Amino acid sequence: MWKSVVGHDVSVSVETQGDDWDTDPDFVNDISEKEQRWGAKTIEGSGRTEHINIHQLRNKVSEEHDVLRKKEMESGPKASHGYGGRFGVERDRMDKSAVGHEYVAEVEKHSSQTDAAKGFGGKYGVERDRADKSAVGFDYKGEVEKHTSQKDYSRGFGGRYGVEKDKWDKAALGYDYKGETEKHESQRDYAKGFGGQYGIQKDRVDKSAVGFNEMEAPTTAYKKTTPIEAASSGTRGLKAKFESMAEEKRKREEEEKAQQVARRQQERKAVTKRSPEAPQPVIAMEEPAVPAPLPKKISSEAWPPVGTPPSSESEPVRTSREHPVPLLPIRQTLPEDNEEPPALPPRTLEGLQVEEEPVYEAEPEPEPEPEPEPENDYEDVEEMDRHEQEDEPEGDYEEVLEPEDSSFSSALAGSSGCPAGAGAGAVALGISAVAVYDYQGEGSDELSFDPDDVITDIEMVDEGWWRGRCHGHFGLFPANYVKLLE
C-alpha cells in the first residue's frame, strides 16, 4: 500500500488542544447542575473527582506491577550467579565438588607403561624414602636367640654373682632374709593395751573411753520462768552482765563462809583444849550442825520471831539482828566496779530474797524455800557461838544475813501498807523519785519504767537497789537510774 502513496504529499492536520477555561475567552461550561452536585465530571481545580475510571485504573495497576517485578529481579537471587558466580567470577561460592569442562583427570598408566624398576625403593633402590619399612633386603642378617644350652645363667636375678643390683627383683628374697613372725597369744603382754601398761601410756588411751573415776553430778532441768517484761525488753547485755556479777558475788560469799566455818571450828577446838572443865556445851553445839533435819527446826524458829518471841533463846538472835543496822555502809562498799550511773549495780543476796520470803510468809504452810535454810543454819551456829565466845570478832555472816531480816520486815511493811518499824533502819516511806533512764525489769520482783516516770513509796533497802511503786507494781529498781524529788 505504501507504494501507492509514493509521490503524494500527505499532510495530517493535528488539532491543538484548547487552553484552560480561565484563559480561553470562548470557554463554554457544559457541566450540568447534577454533574456539579454529584461529581460526575472532573473539573481541574474544583476539588471534585469523577467516578473511577476502570481503564485508567487497570493501566496504572499493570504499570506498578511491572515496576515491582523489575525491583524483585534486581534485588532477588539471580540464577546466573550459581556455581562460581556470574561468568565464574565468584570463586568463593563455587561448589568444591563441581568439576568444569576444563578439568583433566590423571589416569593411572597401564601395566605395560609402568617402569617396574622403580618399585620397592625406586630404580635400583635409590629412592630410600619410598622403601617399604617392613621389607627386608638380602643384606639383612637376623639375630637368633641363643639356645638354653648357650645361656649364662650366672647373670640372672641381680646380675652375675648378684652384682647388678639395679636389675634385682624387688619381690625376691635372699637366703639372708629373716622374717619377723607375730607372737602367739600366750606370748603377748596384754598389760599394755588400752592406755599402755597399767594406764601409763596416756597418748594411746581412747579419747571416748571413760574411767570409773569420772562421775558426773546429776543436773537439774529446772529453768526460771522469764516474765513478759523481761522477755520483751532489749537489755539482754545488762542481764548477762548482772548475772555474771551476781554469780561472782555468790561464789565469793560462799568462799568467805567456808573460810569462816573452818576458822570457827579451829577456834572451837582451841577453846575446848584450853577449857577442859566445860566440854559438854561445845559438844552440844557442834552436834546440831551435822544432822540433816536441823534446817527445818531452824527455819521454824527463824520465821515466827517477826511477830512475837517464842523463847528466850531466840531473843539474842533478834537483838543481834536489830543491832547490826549500822553495818549497811560496810555491805554497800563491796561493789566497787559499778560507780558509773548508767550501769546496773550488783544485786545482793538480800535483794534476791526480798520477794521470795514474803511469798512464803503469806502462805499457810510455814515451810520456806530451801535457799535461805543453809544461811539460817550458819546464822544459828554463829549466834550460839557468840553466846559462848564474847571475845570473838564479828564475821561476814552478819553482813550477809542482816539485810535479809531488814528487807523481810520492809517487805511486810510494804505488803501491809503500814510503815516499817525500827528494825529496818534504812527504810523511809513517803519518798518519791523521778526516773532518769529507761529500765526494764529482769525478774518478777523488779520494776519497769520509762524516763520521767514518778516512783513513790521508795524504801532504801540498799545503796545500789531501792524498792518502790510505779504503774501499780511494787518491786526493786536500781538507785542510780532515778533522781530523788525534794
Swiss-Prot record:
A single Gene Ontology CC term: plasma membrane
Bias kind Acidic residues: ranges: 353-383, 390-405
Modification Phosphothreonine, positions: T308
KW 4Fe-4S (keyword) present: no
Cellular localisation: Membrane; Cytoplasm; Mitochondrion
Residue list for modification Phosphoserine: S275
Molecular function per GO: actin filament binding; protein kinase binding; RNA polymerase II-specific DNA-binding transcription factor binding; SH3 domain binding; signaling adaptor activity
Pfam families: HS1_rep (PF02218), SH3_1 (PF00018)
Region (Involved in HAX-1 binding): 27-66
Keyword check for Cytoplasm: yes
An individual GO BP term: positive regulation of protein import into nucleus
Modified residues (N6-acetyllysine): K41, K123, K192, K241
Basic and acidic residues biased stretches: 243-276, 315-324
Tissue expression notes: Expressed only in tissues and cells of hematopoietic origin.
Positions where Phosphotyrosine occurs in the chain: Y140, Y198, Y222, Y378, Y397
Recorded topology in the membrane: Peripheral membrane protein
Positions of the SH3 domain: 428-486
Cortactin repeats: 79-115, 116-152, 153-189, 190-212
Bias type Low complexity, positions: 406-419
Residue ranges that the Swiss-Prot or TrEMBL entry lists as coiled coil: none
Keywords: Acetylation, Cytoplasm, Membrane, Mitochondrion, Phosphoprotein, Repeat, SH3 domain
Oligomer status and interactors: Associates with the SH2 and SH3 domains of LCK. Binding to he LCK SH3 domain occurs constitutively, while binding to the LCK SH2 domain occurs only upon TCR stimulation. A similar binding pattern was observed with LYN, but not with FYN in which the FYN SH2 region associates upon TCR stimulation but the FYN SH3 region does not associate regardless of TCR stimulation. Directly associates with HAX1, through binding to its C-terminal region. Interacts with HS1BP3. Interacts with FES/FPS. Interacts (via SH2 domain) with FGR. Forms a multiprotein complex with LYN and ANKRD54.
Stated role: Substrate of the antigen receptor-coupled tyrosine kinase. Plays a role in antigen receptor signaling for both clonal expansion and deletion in lymphoid cells. May also be involved in the regulation of gene expression.
Protein name as it appears in the record: Hematopoietic lineage cell-specific protein
Species of origin: Homo sapiens
